[in-house]
């Protein structure tokens, strides 16, 4: 089914207001959920909203909380989210990283006691739209086995890197082959994943999303490489924020909250003049796109370049929403 942007946003806002979220906060939060969904990231927009509301009702999310600065060391700052709404806080933290970068050329904000930020790519995009290189990542609850293990001990720990090209080039990836949100998208669509997503109960690689959702045996991206990347991202986020690690979130909390996050903005125009920057970026993009195709009918694309077209399509023709998800939201 298709739903208009405004209808989606108003439904999000209705549910938030019904839970006594302040009107201005409900408006901004609903807008961010609608923007994420319109951009085609359904897994962390409309599909994620019911779980977000569940955590709000349990008290994991404190809607009136505001992040506060704990420590400033020039280009690096520590902040405490106080369990505020994740996507609103993340947006503020990337804005702050850009402000610091305006002074020092680079800005780093390390955040503790944060909630799930929903679409992490939105914050990299936020920086790149204003001409900065945007880098951010978060740790999580333990939802993936380290390489060689059966038991979940590491996070998917999404990493985002966005570069101010035209259109914006952005990698937005978890350290697993698939996030749980994308597994849900495939399951709801009744299809297998395109590549192996995890292990079945016998330890064999599988593309069945439901199996991996149930047994929690996600496949790390690049096998041992994704496992290792997850671990070091967790270490850095924990140290810079003085916040909780994956191990601590998992052992001390009953759900995924009070996570640690990093936001980095780099003012690249201080390092290279505009014309040279554009020439170099266009050279890179053209060199990649003009490689001989493995399939003549399938164009080579750069990461993130699809979002502009997806958003335009959804704006013109309505946003695809799974009927069961929509009915769930309507019932909240």
UniProtKB/Swiss-Prot annotation:
What Gene Ontology terms describe where this protein resides (cellular component)? cytoplasm
One Gene Ontology term of the molecular function aspect: NAD+ binding
Catalytic activity annotated for this protein?
3-dehydro-L-gulonate + NAD(+) = 2,3-dioxo-L-gulonate + NADH + H(+); 3-dehydro-L-gulonate + NADP(+) = 2,3-dioxo-L-gulonate + NADPH + H(+)
> What is the designated name of this protein?
2,3-diketo-L-gulonate reductase
User: What family is it from?
Assistant: Belongs to the LDH2/MDH2 oxidoreductase family. DlgD subfamily.
Assembly and binders? Homodimer.
Give the originating organism: Pasteurella multocida (strain Pm70)
Q: Which residues form the active site?
A: 44
Q: Name one Pfam family in it.
A: Ldh_2
- Source taxon at top rank: Bacteria
Q: Where does NAD(+) bind?
A: 168-174, 224-225, 304-306
What Enzyme Commission number(s) appear in the record? 1.1.1.130
Q: Which cysteines are joined by disulfide bonds?
A: none
Q: What is its main location?
A: cytoplasm
UniProt keyword annotations, A-Z: Cytoplasm, NAD, Oxidoreductase
Q: What does this protein do?
A: Catalyzes the reduction of 2,3-diketo-L-gulonate in the presence of NADH, to form 3-keto-L-gulonate.
Q: Where in the cell is it found?
A: Cytoplasm
